[in-house]
Amino acid sequence: MTDLDVRPYADTDRAAVLAIFDGNADDYFGAGDRAWLEETLDEPDGPAFVVAVDGVAAAFGGYEVWDHYNKALLYWGMAARRYHRCGLGKLLLFERLLHIAQYADPPTRYVTVDTSPQVAPFFRRCGFQETAVWPQGYRSGMTMHELRFDLAATSPAALTMQRDAALAAARNAIGRL
């Protein structure tokens, strides 16, 4: 049986997280993003998490709370290519949303993310609303989609149920690999 766990990022996950990035770089990231990821791993701007499969980081992402705005910003959010379409991204997302709802300091209402046109539909399916589209919004020239999730429209109990459902679905999907 495969062990699947969401836990805080640890320095020992660094090589696995960089490998996740490298496996996705051509399709999802621009030039210079690896250096930014390395900076994030060295000094995270807020809590960071991994989804571990049999103890090895298979997905990574975190968030930071903005002191002067009523929002948190999701950063990164990627899964090893081998596990695409297995639900690790959804599990990681709902773990982060739940953590923000329960522990953000200061408490916050909105969770925002900026992402590519390729990934924006995933966030919309998970309850985010698109707030802006910026043609050439990334320095790489790619269009940027900004999306927002309103924590006031849900509850920690509802987020826990969504996280638990995502965990069960991911376990099922990985068990079929």
Residue ranges and their predicted role:
Residues 3-17:
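A short beta-loop-alpha structural element at the N-terminal edge
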Residues 26-50, 62:
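Active-site rim helix/loop that mediates acceptor-substrate recognition in acyltransferases
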Residues 50, 56-65, 71-78:
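Conserved beta-strand in the GNAT
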Residues 66, 80, 84, 114-116:
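Residue-level recognition of the GNAT/N-acetyltransferase active site
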Residues 79, 85-98:
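Conserved acetyl-CoA-binding loop-helix of GNAT-fold acetyltransferases
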Residues 100-116:
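Conserved GNAT acetyl-CoA-binding A-motif
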Residues 112-114, 124, 129-148:
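Conserved catalytic-core motifs of GNAT/GCN5-like acyltransferases
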Residues 154-177:
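Acidic/histidine-enriched, glycine/proline-rich intrinsically disordered or flexible terminal extensions
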